[in-house]
Design a protein with these regions (language model features):
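Surface-exposed alpha-helical segments enriched in charged/polar residues
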Residues: 65-69, 129, 133, 137
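Conserved acetyl-CoA-binding loop-helix of GNAT-fold acetyltransferases
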Residues: 120-134, 157, 161
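GNAT-family acyltransferases
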Residues: 1-117, 150-154, 160-182
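Conserved GNAT acetyl-CoA-binding A-motif
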Residues: 137-148
């Protein structure tokens, strides 16, 4: 199996397709990253102060360029979430293998950024189904961690249904994480 950094796979499940983010996604992703209802649900932990609230095309372009450089450096993969049927780009996910001197060494971090009107259980379930089926092997991780703040009720329901359990301690100094292990 090729590394996700050699050849980035396209995944599909239910309502969505995931494919590597590129500059063609710029304008539609700006709708997600400028959505003031969505931004509080994004996981910006350990992102050097970036809260992912982008309000200009130029700032969105810079983010996509950074994601591309990070991909080339094998730091993380950022996929665009495309709603099938409408071919609408509704957000992104990020996934990476975490190396650390703590109990979550060799776990993956999954970030899910969705436009607020698409922050619904069925779409999140499809994202998690892809994650559960492919990401453990693709990223060589023994568990996947993702964040869901308490008011993210649809996300929390989807996480529990997909076998994720709350982590009742801080992860990298932060609260509100859920984990699924192999």
């Amino acid at each position: 199996m090729k590394s996700v950094y050699e050849e980035c796979p396209v995944y599909g499940k239910g309502l969505i397709t995931l494919r590597k983010t590129n500059n063609e996604d710029l304008e539609e992703l700006l709708e997600c990253y400028s959505d003031e209802k969505a931004v509080p649900l994004f996981n910006s932990d350990n992102c050097n102060g970036d809260n992912f609230n982008y309000t200009t095309i130029e700032r969105m372009r810079q983010a996509i360029e950074f994601w591309e450089v990070s991909y080339k450096n094998e730091e993380f993969v950022r996929w665009t979430i495309i709603l099938k049927g409408m071919n609408k780009k509704i957000g992104t996910i990020e996934m990476f293998h975490r190396n650390a001197d703590d109990e979550f060494n060799h776990y993956g971090i999954l970030r899910i950024d969705l436009q607020s009107k698409y922050e619904i259980q069925s779409i999140i379930e499809d994202i998690l189904a892809i994650s559960n089926e492919y990401f453990f092997e693709a990223f060589e991780v023994k568990g996947i961690l993702t964040k869901a703040i308490q008011k993210a009720e649809e996300r929390i329901c989807a996480l529990k249904k997909a076998g994720f359990k709350p982590v009742y301690k801080k992860v990298m100094g932060y609260d509100d994480y859920y984990c699924r292990e192999i």
